[in-house]
């Protein structure tokens, strides 16, 4: 069952996104130290959807405009692989069915091959490269922009 996280779930969200096997992959050099992690401001926004389709799996949708959201996902080690892929597909379908969302995009730094693979597995297609746009450990990386439209997802079901 799909759970939309609220400010009451901040500790749970922080425990997942702050996990040692996740935090280094979902942050850049401007991220706060782990001790200061707090997602309450995001969880309080009506237009931001922090979804937990399966235990240990988070999918965060942030609006770009009235019909397009940017997505990022994270899963605890025991929820990776097929579980995360199914959770991401469920969250994507939920967004298209329950919000005005018509398109979902993501930006994947070139060093994150697992995130790139997940995006492609759920039907997202590469749409371009945002060159030299992600700073991690003092190194600047390109990001691949991927996207999927509501109609494309419906055709795959």
Q: Model-derived features: where do they sit?
A:
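Active-site rim helix/loop that mediates acceptor-substrate recognition in acyltransferases
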Residues: 27-48
